[in-house]
Amino acid sequence: MNISSALRQVVHGTRWHSKRKSYKVLFWREITPLAVPIFMENACVLLMGVLSTFLVSWLGKDAMAGVGLADSFNMVIMAFFAAIDLGTTVVVAFSLGKRDRRRARVATRQSLVIMTLFAVLLATLIHHFGEQIIDFVAGDATTEVKALALTYLELTVLSYPAAAITLIGSGALRGAGNTKIPLLINGSLNILNIIISGILIYGLFSWPGLGFVGAGLGLTISRYIGAVAILWVLAIGFNPALRISLKSYFKPLNFSIIWEVMGIGIPASVESVLFTSGRLLTQMFVAGMGTSVIAGNFIAFSIAALINLPGSALGSASTIITGRRLGVGQIAQAEIQLRHVFWLSTLGLTAIAWLTAPFAGVMASFYTQDPQVKHVVVILIWLNALFMPIWSASWVLPAGFKGARDARYAMWVSMLSMWGCRVVVGYVQGIMLGWGVVGVWMGMFADWAVRAVLFYWRMVTGRWLWKYPRSEPQKCEKKPVVSE
């Protein structure tokens, strides 16, 4: 018996083989229509971010380090907005699964109103305390880097209301099953960001440009264009289930729906903010290791995010698929589909990471020609590939759990793993033992490992479906009266 025959017999004996036709239907009819546009959207966002980094990197290493430090704080705020966006996505998907369009519209409208007002308040506070924030984040970075980081932060906080509108509006459209419109809007937004930022930084024709200031200003302008596009799409009813007129934003709020969104969004936002705050703290560890290490760490995260794109798209798709299935009471289907998405992500991402790791130096050369920075990037990308098999259990599974409105478990696990592993292990290995940026990243991988074990256990035990008991017959809930 040759090897191929033996492998064929092993495959034929698995449960997957007997259900391969249903998995094929699931992949092409459920996963692909959702995940591919989300993947393309995320790819466009990240690629435009890479190009933005290129634009800034030509201004020098200090400029790139300044943007990296300011963006490490901006990520905390964007993570909070994305968490509320997730709550909106789940409520919209669940409501439309029950064919309750009115509730989906009200959830979208009220999320947009609340988060826009909150973003204005947040931007005002951060603008006022910007210098103290940068001093805290930048640690022992040079005075020049801190000054550039403060300039970039003060410009980008002006875009927070627009970012909130774009994120929440896009999330609502995805929850309604329309992933193409967010792709077009966010893709166009990022292309505009490159064009506008390029002109503002380096000038056009005889105009010399604004230099470093143009980077933050270009991002802010493009975000407001994206916010206007989202509001216009919702106003004209491009997706009939989410037609929201401009005057409806001034109607009274319905707090029962707000609390439903926040019931998912607040635990998810606490998780995201604590996670990104912990990540920010680890960036502070790196900030004292020199400009080359700061830049190399920033570039390595950018490349790793590109490698993880398919997994991020599958995670977003799993939230929508789970919410839809549970909205119509298909509990077993929700469980089967989450397992399928998880294994698809695990195998796919591991293959991508291992195939791209040998080209880490080539990828780094697109960002910089500094040999010290490139050396840091190569080491970190190889480490990322080594630990990639546990990434999907850490990130795709909790995304699916949130579609089942099981957000609190992910919050507590993230708090434990972030502060118990990433921060503590990163500090001990990176600072106390002198391992440098490698020790900080080993703390991150310890965080992944703890998350992977706890989330995988949650999946196999079925406890993430605790709100949907199988033993009891499904009861029809009386829909509350919702006013638009």
Locate each region found by the language model.
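N-terminal transmembrane alpha-helices
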Residues: 22-54, 58-59, 75-87, 119-123, ...
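Small-residue-rich hydrophobic transmembrane alpha-helices
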Residues: 64-124, 163-182, 294-360, 391-414
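Small-residue hotspots at the loop-to-helix junctions and early N-terminal turns
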Residues: 61-72, 149, 153, 216, ...
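Short runs within selected transmembrane alpha-helices of multi-pass transporters and secretion channels
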Residues: 85, 155-174, 182-190, 215-231, ...
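Helix-terminus/linker motif at the lipid-water interface of multi-pass membrane proteins
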Residues: 46-65, 134-143, 199-210, 269, ...
